[in-house]
Regions:
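Catalytic-core environment of secreted peptidases
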Residues: 362-364, 369, 406-408, 499-541, ...
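Active-site core segment of subtilase-fold serine proteases
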Residues: 310-413, 434, 579
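Conserved beta-strands of PAS-like sensory domains
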Residues: 160-201
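Protease zymogen maturation seam
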Residues: 62-66, 232-236, 290-349, 362-363, ...
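Autoinhibitory propeptides
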Residues: 2-4, 212-230, 253-325, 627
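Juxtamembrane extracytoplasmic/periplasmic/luminal helical "stalk" adjacent to the first N-terminal
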Residues: 26-86
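Hydrolase catalytic cores
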Residues: 392-395, 419-420, 444-445, 449, ...
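Substrate-binding/access-modulating region of protease and related hydrolase catalytic domains
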Residues: 345, 419-493, 503-506, 530-538, ...
Length: 627
């Protein structure tokens, strides 16, 4: 009994210390000198920084392509050894259907000094007769005969890049040479010039698009990529309307007649009308005067934006080909350590609302759900840009399968929702419909690597709908190095993500501001790309899926957490960067997967309620001691 008496004051004192300690910041703070990207740069300075980032992406993608090609050649050697010529033809034909970049393969018999060439049905005979191609293939053949590897520099033929690579078998009796297309470099450059806003995008005049200042809706002209910083884009003959009371069929016919248009497209409580001859301003005046709606706003276009110590044996080092050399982003976010706590769950689905996904990519096999195509509902949500496939790979590429890249989660499934077309852009309507569809079909996390600088109530309604269904919404802030809030990232229901580089500096292109929640890696991130290929891309589009993957891991290890609790937990388990605490350049800091999952293992109580929660626990303990 006497022991209980002296335990009570001891517990009380300990409680006081604990409460004081818990009120102090618990984040790991790392102060590293940060480049002054926030200082207003002239357009030429910003352009040069972005060009440098693009060059890094292209260089990394070039090396990734070569590493992947070498692995393909080794696979071909294993599969074709001992096969007949007909079997080899059949194998190569089938391989080239899924690996179209492997333009030509040569089987080299070193004992006989002979080689046999296999090309796909789409091969161009004149390409093989080109001097550079012939010389490179001859050099590759000579190297194999000498039991040496071969790799040519890149060269251009008719505006397309190629290289030749060859490998001898370990016993020196045969080898394989390949002519490899590097069309992926052209695709990456084209996409990243848009994604990093190095060019005016989208071009005015395409699809009758207007550019306006997001605050005033006054017309502005976008001549350079830098001009996108203060621009939003909308369809000049369309309007989004939310009525105070939904119109009946007769009223819709009346509106259609007044506007010279088809009946409006309806999504939730909102309608989109497209007029054949009226501008947005005329449409806005018509609805404001005649219908007194809740809102009548432009139909905006959205664009892509890509401790308890753990034992050494618990740190997972996957065998994926590109992991050790190119996936700096996973160790930087403590993802490997986090896998010791959770590798995810197939029951927690991440929707990628984007350009679609390459559903046939071998490094995404079994990870992709059927999804939905908003752009063309009759078709599957296949990716015709590359952006969505790259985002999906960051989240859920197969881990430890010996090829390509490792995703952040092992078991979480990706639900592709295609809302952006082949140009990488989409409408408010398509993005909103995609969000609602994902929320209605079981997504627990929605990734939005897209944005615009104008608020759209229509889109906000869709965001609130998903949030009210307990979905964690994660969005990229944008790539214009501006403090201007980007949407949907700046909506209060959305978790906003900006980008860091490998040095934990804010990436030179990354947007910033008081609305930013956290940072995640976004510079030269290696991931999956259409056509069974891989690419390194930069952008807050690449940072956002890191956080979506973390949210999925958190919800996998603790399914009882609400979306708000998941978001609070991620904010409070970061590597603090810059000024201690929250700041506009780094938000709360860079995500720490291990720390977040460690926190999620425990029953989660929001920090502001923790003193009360702790007090209740202590009262319970004291009561138990009194019995």
């Amino acid at each position: 009994m006497s022991r209980h008496k002296w335990l009570k004051p001891l517990i009380g004192a300990a409680a006081g210390v604990l409460i004081i300690t818990l009120m102090l910041p618990s984040r790991d703070h790392r102060h590293t000198p940060q480049p002054e990207y926030a200082a207003k740069m002239v357009p030429q300075q910003e352009k040069q920084l972005k060009k440098g980032m693009l060059a890094l992406d292209l260089s990394a993608t070039d090396t990734i392509t070569r590493m992947d090609a070498r692995q393909d050649i080794e696979y071909v050697m294993r599969e074709l050894n001992g096969k007949t010529n007909d079997q080899k033809k059949h194998f190569v034909r089938k391989l080239q259907q899924s690996h179209s970049h492997l333009h030509t393969l040569q089987w080299i018999n070193t004992r006989q000094g002979k080689s046999t060439t296999y090309t796909g049905s789409k091969a161009q005979p004149r390409l093989l007769n080109h001097v550079q191609v012939k010389n490179s293939l001859d050099a590759a053949r000579r190297s194999v005969l000498q039991n040496k590897s071969y790799e040519s520099a890149a060269f251009q033929v008719e505006g397309r890049k190629y290289f030749v690579m060859a490998e001898p078998a370990t016993d020196g009796t045969y080898g394989v040479a390949a002519l490899v297309s590097q069309q992926v470099l052209h695709d990456v450059e084209k996409h990243q010039r848009k994604n990093l806003r190095l060019i005016p995008y989208p071009k005015e005049g395409s699809y009758k698009i207007e550019s306006v200042h997001p605050d005033t809706l006054h017309d502005i002209t976008v001549k350079t990529g830098h001009d996108n910083e203060n621009a939003s884009h909308y369809f000049e003959n369309e309007i989004v309307v939310r009525f105070r009371q939904n119109p009946d069929q007769q009223q819709l016919r009346e509106i259609a007649a007044d506007l010279n248009c088809e009946p409006g497209r309806k999504l939730g409580y909102t309608y989109v009308f497209h007029s054949n001859n009226m501008s947005f301003k005329e449409l806005q005046q018509y609805f404001s005067q005649k219908w007194n709606p809740v809102y009548a706003e432009p139909h905006y276009m959205y664009l892509t934006n890509k401790k308890t110590p753990v034992k050494a044996s618990d740190v997972s080092i996957p065998n994926d080909l590109l992991f050790s050399r190119y996936q700096w982003n996973l160790p930087a976010t403590e993802t490997n350590r986090g896998w010791a706590l959770s590798k995810g769950s197939k029951n927690v689905v991440v929707a990628v609302v984007d350009t679609g996904v390459d559903m046939d990519h071998p490094d995404l096999k079994g990870q992709i759900l059927p999804g939905h195509n908003v752009v063309n509902p009759k078709e599957k949500p296949y990716d015709d840009v590359g952006h969505g496939t790259h985002v999906a790979g960051i989240i859920s590429a197969l881990v430890n399968n010996g090829e390509g890249v490792a995703g952040m989660t092992w078991y979480n499934k990706v639900m592709p929702v295609k809302v952006l077309d082949q140009s990488g852009s989409g409408t408010t309507y398509s993005v909103a419909e995609g969000i609602i569809w994902a929320a209605d079909h079981g997504a627990k996390v929605i990734n939005l690597s897209l944005g615009n600088y104008a608020q759209a109530e229509f889109l906000h309604d869709a965001i609130k709908y998903a949030y009210d269904k307990d979905v964690v919404l994660v969005a990229a802030t944008g790539n214009d190095n501006t403090e201007r809030p980007g949407y949907p990232a700046a909506y209060p229901e959305v978790f906003a993500v900006s980008a860091t580089d490998a040095s934990m500096h804010r990436a030179s292109f990354s947007n910033y501001g008081d609305y930013v929640d956290v940072m995640a890696p976004g510079a030269s991130i290696a991931s999956t790309y259409p056509g069974n290929q891989y690419a390194a891309l930069s952008g807050t589009s690449m940072a956002s899926p890191h956080v979506s993957a973390l949210a999925a891991l958190v919800r996998s290890i603790n399914p009882d957490l609400t979306n708000k609790e998941v978001m609070d937990l991620m904010r409070n388990s970061v590597i603090d960067l810059g000024t201690p605490g929250h700041d506009k350049y780094f938000g709360y800091g860079q995500i720490d997967v291990y720390k977040a999952l460690k926190a999620a293992q425990r029953p989660y109580v929001p920090l502001q309620l923790y003193p009360q929660h702790l007090g209740d626990k202590i009262k319970s303990l004291l009561k138990m001691l009194e019995t």
